[in-house]
Amino acid sequence: MAISRSQLVKELEPGLNALFGLEYKRYENQHAEIYTNESSDRAFEEEVMLSGFGNAQVKGEGAGVSFDDAQETYTARYSHETVALAFAITEEAIEDNLYDRLSARYTKALARSMSNAKQVKAIDPLIKGLPSTATFKSGDGVALFSTAHTTVSGPNVANTLATQSDLNETSLENSLIQIGKMTDERGLRIAARGLKMIIPSENQFTAERLMKSQGRTGTADNDINAIVSMGMVPQGYRVNNYLTDSDAFYILTDVPNGMKMFTRAPLTTAMEGDFDTGNVRYKARERYSFGVSDFRGIFGVEGA
């Protein structure tokens, strides 16, 4: 359906002082704070988790050396989606509009819609991967944030707290402790650490106090803020305005191949006129996918 003169009645008459509703600011590329972006040239991408070797064994004098096996464990698949939107304007609406160019106005609105869709899709794994929802799975078939990520040799690896908690000094410290305890597929310590915290806007004031105060917050004790003095979250925090759980928080770790975005086709726009009707059509389109390869790349807590 094309935008016609019946939908733009006031713009066909002189005396209109202002048009408003399409000039809002927008939150730009907040997904870039979470995901590593890579390009793709196929319908989907797959990344395979490998298992190395277990702990080396003591070899007795004259005895044979122990052998171990390495293997593939699970596969993370990124299936690209095509995201697109279009609009059309009648020839008469373009001719009779007395104010700004309709095409310029609505192509800006089209760009806004495409940008918003990307931010919503980007945050989907973080929302749906939380324990109470658990509909977004990592490659091992377990909810993205879980205490039961299975490994080849065990024990399970956790990237959430056993008891969900709101963001405070204790929950943040416990999260950082658990990150430091992460192991690989054979149970070997991997020296993981937190890098950056991602939070909803409701948590920004709490995060500012936790990450910037030199002393402990919420206590009369004259203690230093250990999180700050030890540099436990060196990249600080970022607010993501698309998170819907007001008390959740997430910590990106330095584990490689964690949260990833693949761009199959970057954003392109096109326009064409229809010979029969005279309508002019405008389209925007891109293809991409969001997901996770190694769940150890992020730690998420749902809040109490």
PLM regions and their residue ranges:
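Solvent-exposed, flexible loop/coil residues
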Residues: Q71, T82, A93, N97-L98, ...
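Long, contiguous amphipathic alpha-helices that act as assembly "spine/axial" helices in icosahedral shell
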Residues: T75-S132, M197, Y282-A284
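Sequence/fold signature of self-assembling virion shell proteins
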Residues: A2-K10, V142-D184, A191-K196, S201-A304
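Glycine-rich, mobile lid/loop segments that gate access to catalytic sites or pores
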Residues: K118-N156, T160
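A generic local secondary-structure boundary/capping motif
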Residues: T75, E185-G187
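N-terminal alpha-helical "arm" segments
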Residues: M1-Y27
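Solvent-exposed alpha-helices and their adjacent loops that cap or buttress functional pockets
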Residues: S79, R189-A191
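Assembly/oligomerization interface modules of large self-assembling protein complexes
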Residues: K25-V83
